[in-house]
Amino acid sequence: KSFIMPAMNSQFYTTDKDAHNLKKSRGLKPQEGWTYETGMKTITNSSSLKLAVFNMDISNKFGWASEEELGIGTNTKAEIQINKGDFRNTGIEVEYTKLVGDNWRYNLGVTYSNPEINDSGEWVQDNARLQFVAGIGYQKNKFNAGLNYLFLGDRNDSYYHEVTSSGNRYYALPNRNIMNATLQYSADKNNSVALNFYNILDKKDVVNDYENYGLPFNWTLTYNYSF
């Protein structure tokens, strides 16, 4: 069972020009629903295999819309939290992890599902149907390294999609490919330094329904102290 309250500031949203905004924002309902999952897993000293099927049923799913879209103002940049409608998702996921020798490990995972949302009486795709992940890692003494890959396919329509004369949607978001890596050295249990590489393939990926692009290849050098 899940239950999520609206953001605190969404409950008191208003502008000087339109007091109706405040009334509308106070009508926000909690997002709540149920998730059912069952499956099997096999675990040994060097590997694990997990298989699961799941079903999600969510009411009053949170979303965001501009004043202009809601007809309560003209500001296209002022995003207001709203209840979009009902959400459902049924799918299957498989995950495999393997240790190779004393230092190496790898993992593979795939999820296929059918995420849909109903905002106006019609169920439409709300997210990518296919997700694939893969990773490889190495650890020896105080050194740790990892390389991870994510693929999102069969994605939902863009926010700016068009509708054909037959009523069929087209213009789905392109597939997404992202690869990241981390090199970490832990001097002791409290101190560590990490070099992180993001978007190694330097893909111009669309990251959301509004067709915003992710960052190009970039990296960070971080120091962590744990206590």
Pin down the residues of each PLM region.
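Surface-exposed extracellular loop regions of Gram-negative outer-membrane beta-barrel proteins
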Residues: 1-37, 48, 53-79, 150-164, ...
